[in-house]
UniProtKB/Swiss-Prot annotation:
Pfam families: PQQ_2. Gene3D superfamilies: YVTN repeat-like/Quinoprotein amine dehydrogenase. InterPro entries: PQQ_b-propeller_rpt, PQQ_rpt_dom, Quinoprotein_ADH-like_sf, WD40/YVTN_repeat-like_dom_sf. It comes from Rickettsia prowazekii (strain Madrid E). The lineage of its organism: Bacteria, Pseudomonadati, Pseudomonadota, Alphaproteobacteria, Rickettsiales. Transmembrane segments: none annotated. This is Uncharacterized protein RP232.
Length: 415
């Protein structure tokens, strides 16, 4: 018995003896290559992006509970109403003024099942909903009455989008893009790539750009499809990147976070350790740089800001891809053993004194606030504890800032 026990413990004994024991085990923060500054260029947080009226005390405001269970998608704000989708496939309409759920409707026949993915589109007084199943369901936004539903060929994990007044687009996990009539849900056109087999990667919500819709597949493809008939305008594949080979159906061939775009360009972080800039009209690569494990990106002022798993925030020149600013997002006192965490997309806030700052929120309840002065963006942020598990933020139609966890919604002051 003792011999058997010794044999079972042998691998652990060897590990502890060869310098690979607990003191040397590295996590994703240690393993992610760090970015370094490459150019000394100014950073402007100017007004070509949304500027949010923000101070940290907003996060102490009243909390609303608009969902019956844990939310799995970003809330939708229409007037006084908040529409939410929860893990049990309940869609709820919550009145802010009355501080209560006005109606709630369960989308699934399996009420005890948990769902992930999907989202809500509000379009022409209706709610188009996907919830991590094969169904697209349409409800009347005012009453919650089900109008129509359609079963698609496979599971849908991203929210529907409107291509125009009469066309809704959905995308399945098996790389099928389907355009549907917004009234009848009849298929108008579809496009299909190789079915994904193995992937845990981020799924990009399609982007409508001029007469095209930009879609990505987990086979490592980015395509521009004509919104009227689904014709392929251009097709870019990650296998075209010059020093890597992307393997279809594996995460190295996929995107890591929400891409960002302006009127002419698309920026995509890939599992190949590449950040690429594509021309939206042609699909051609304008530049590519080495940048591993990117969590989030944002075009702000004259910079492309990225956050990676090394707990760094960096500012890049969007024209060249060169790094002009890097700062650490460290909170723990023992910086030698930083834990991995999730960061939201950076945003610019302006306080009551009209002072602008760059802000980064982590889901573990830390705000990193970078001030800017005549010398540029400061390297060392103010670090402030806030509520945990903030997943979304943005502006409502009345320009009120909101923050949302998976349970609560908090509102800031108006502009």
């Amino acid at each position: 018995m003792k011999k058997k026990l010794a044999l079972l413990l042998l691998p652990f004994i060897l590990i502890s003896c060869n310098g690979l024991g607990s003191k040397s085990v590295k996590n994703i923060v240690d393993l992610t290559p760090k970015l370094v500054i490459q150019t000394n260029e100014p950073i402007y947080l100017d007004s070509n992006t949304k500027i949010y009226p923000f101070n940290v005390n907003m996060l102490k405001n009243k909390q609303y509970s608009p969902a019956k269970s844990k939310m799995i998608a970003e809330p939708v704000f229409i007037g006084d109403m908040i529409y939410t989708l929860d893990i049990r496939a309940n869609i709820s309409a919550f009145s802010i003024e009355k501080n209560k759920i006005i109606w709630s409707y369960n989308l699934s026949k399996h009420k005890k099942d948990n769902y992930i993915g999907g989202g809500i589109l509000h379009h022409n007084g209706k709610l188009y909903i996907t919830y991590g199943a094969r169904l697209l369901i349409v409800l009347d936004a005012k009453s919650g009455y089900e109008i129509i539903r359609k079963e698609l060929p496979d599971i849908i994990r991203i929210k529907p989008i409107a291509l125009n007044d009469h066309t809704i687009l959905v995308q399945t996990i098996s790389n099928q893009t389907i355009a549907l009539d917004s009234e009848t849900l009849k298929t108008l056109w579809d496009h299909e790539s190789i079915a994904e087999i193995l992937s845990t990667s981020y799924s990009m919500i399609p982007i409508v750009q001029h007469d095209n819709v930009i879609v990505t597949y987990n086979t490592g493809q980015v395509l521009a499809l004509n919104i009227k008939n689904g014709e392929v305008k251009w097709n870019f594949e990650f296998t075209n990147l010059n020093d890597h080979t992307a393997i279809p159906n594996f995460d190295t061939s996929s995107i890591l976070c929400t891409p960002v775009h302006d009127s002419m360009n698309l920026y995509i972080a890939t599992g190949l350790g590449k950040l690429i800039k594509l021309n939206l009209l042609t699909g051609s690569v304008l530049w590519q740089i080495n940048a591993d494990d990117i969590q989030s990106m944002s075009l702000i002022g004259n910079s492309l800001f990225i956050i990676n798993n090394a707990r760094q925030i960096a500012a890049l020149n969007p024209e060249t891809g060169k790094v002009k600013f890097v700062a650490d997002l460290n909170y723990e006192k023992n910086d030698k053993r930083l834990k991995s965490t999730t960061f939201l997309v950076p945003f610019v806030g302006v306080d009551n004194n009209n002072q602008r700052s760059l802000n980064v929120i982590s889901v573990d309840g830390i705000l990193y606030n970078f001030n800017i002065d005549s010398n540029g963006l400061k390297m060392n942020p103010h670090i402030i504890k806030i509520i945990k598990n903030i997943r979304y933020y943005g502006l409502r139609s009345n320009n009120t800032l909101y923050f949302s966890t998976d349970r609560q919604v908090i509102f800031g002051s108006q502009i």
